[in-house]
A protein has these predicted regions:
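N-terminal beta-loop-helix "entrance" segment that forms/cooperates
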Residues: 35-58, 223-225
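N-terminal glycine-rich phosphate/adenylate-binding segment common to multiple enzyme folds
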Residues: 50-154, 240
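Buried hydrophobic positions in well-ordered alpha/beta secondary-structure cores of metabolic enzymes
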Residues: 13-16, 68, 129, 171, ...
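Glycine-rich phosphate/nucleotide-binding loop
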Residues: 47-49, 107, 225-325
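Short acidic loop-to-helix transition motifs that present clustered carboxylates
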Residues: 46, 111, 216-223
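Buried hydrophobic packing segments
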Residues: 23, 27, 201, 293-301, ...
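Glycine-rich phosphate/diphosphate-binding loop of Rossmann-like nucleotide-binding domains
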Residues: 8-25, 29-31, 148-219
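Internal helix-turn-beta structural module
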Residues: 283, 303-360
Length: 360
């Protein structure tokens, strides 16, 4: 009997629905080959709906716990209040479902994509594990003496032992399955409250003697990510710094169009999405790159335990760049559905990639 997974699909705004549909084409090919199926439900959550007054409430998020995964396209609209729809939908999902891991693989699919001279696919293969629910994100902002010389704006940065322990432990467990190296990235020399991360790192490291671990300040880590990306395997970091260095990592492997991310609670419903935005100027033209959305499908399948299917998608993406069926990741480098169909054919018909490891 084939396995069945319940998937909620949120296309969102701009190019989001198009690239999500492309990802579903590849998902369908994986279903055919690897003997599982998905039962998909489409949700109309978007920034455009937010403009019309729609809001995502806790009562709307709660039923999603019955699903196995959520596939998200992109959220954002030029006429929406800046950041508010994203906060409503994306932060709503993260907080409501306690998706405490943001997983961002930084993988170079083809040597020609990186701007770093002399680097190859063998040099750049790391995963950024970003804490996804604490730090400064979503905190209240207090403003006093507004409009005067004494105007002051305050918020708060929060780290808990529970939140720190579970994200560092996740990083160690992931490193154990990969190349057994973990690097903590913080700024505890200036932000003393981040010392809790180093304390927890030292405590948990004793339970993972087979994993080499160290810590770097975020400014140094940013430099090393560009100069020596090969020294990184699993990078664990805070919410704010993870947001920044994961985009730097994306630039190292060719740009935001290459990347996918998972907002994960291990063993529970989790959200998977490309890392690019909604790019409204390209919406409806059929020229958006679906590479990130296809990568998100691979991450989702890995989370669901369909590792062989995830590896096949990863191998198909690599093969697409190698053969020229995927010419790039910028808008206009290929037709969205042409790329999706090419990857789907490779997934459906080709052998699993022997050299391609799991996405995360």
């Amino acid at each position: 009997m084939s396995r069945t997974y319940r998937i909620a699909v949120i296309g969102g705004d701009g190019i989001g629905p198009e690239v999500t549909e492309a990802g579903l084409v590849v998902l369908g090919a994986a279903e055919q080959r690897f003997d599982f199926r998905t039962d998909r439900t489409t949700l109309g959550w978007s920034a455009e709906a937010y403009i019309r007054g729609a809001r995502v409430s806790a009562e709307m998020i709660e039923p999603l716990r019955a699903y196995d995964a959520i596939l998200l396209g992109a959220i954002g609209h030029p006429d929406a209040p800046r950041g508010l729809p994203e906060h409503d939908i994306i932060f709503g999902l993260r907080r409501g479902l306690d998706l405490y891991v943001n997983l961002r693989p930084i993988v170079l699919y083809d040597d020609r994509l990186t701007p770093l001279r002399g680097r190859t696919t063998k040099d750049i293969d790391l995963v950024i594990v970003r804490e996804n629910t604490e730090d400064v994100y979503g905190r209240p902002v207090a403003r006093t003496a507004e409009g005067t010389a004494d105007e002051t704006v305050k918020s708060e940065m929060i780290f808990t032992r529970r939140g720190t322990e579970r994200i560092v432990r996740y990083g160690f467990e992931l490193a154990r399955r990969r190349r057994k190296r973990l690097t903590l990235v913080d700024k505890s020399n200036a932000l003393r409250l981040q010392e809790i991360y180093r304390t927890v790192l030292a405590e948990l490291a004793r339970g993972f003697p087979d994993v080499e671990s160290d810590a770097m300040y975020v400014d140094a880590a940013s430099m090393w990510l560009v100069l020596h990306p090969e020294r990184f395997d699993v990078v664990v970091t805070t919410n704010l710094f993870g947001d920044i260095i994961s985009d730097l990592g994306a630039a190292v492997v060719g740009g935001l169009g290459t990347g996918a991310s998972g907002n994960i609670h291990p063993g529970k419903v989790s959200v998977f999405e490309p890392i690019h935005g909604s790019a409204p100027k390209y919406a409806g033209q059929g020229v958006a790159s679906p590479v990130g959305a296809i990568g998100a499908v691979a991450l989702m399948l890995e989370h669901l335990g369909e590792s062989e299917a995830a590896r096949a998608i990863d191998a198909a993406l690599r093969d697409g760049f190698r053969t020229g069926r995927i010419k790039g990741v910028d808008a206009g480098s290929g037709r969205t559905m042409d790329v999706a169909e090419a990857v789907a054919r490779s997934v459906r018909d080709g052998p699993p990639g022997r050299d391609a490891g799991p996405p995360g």
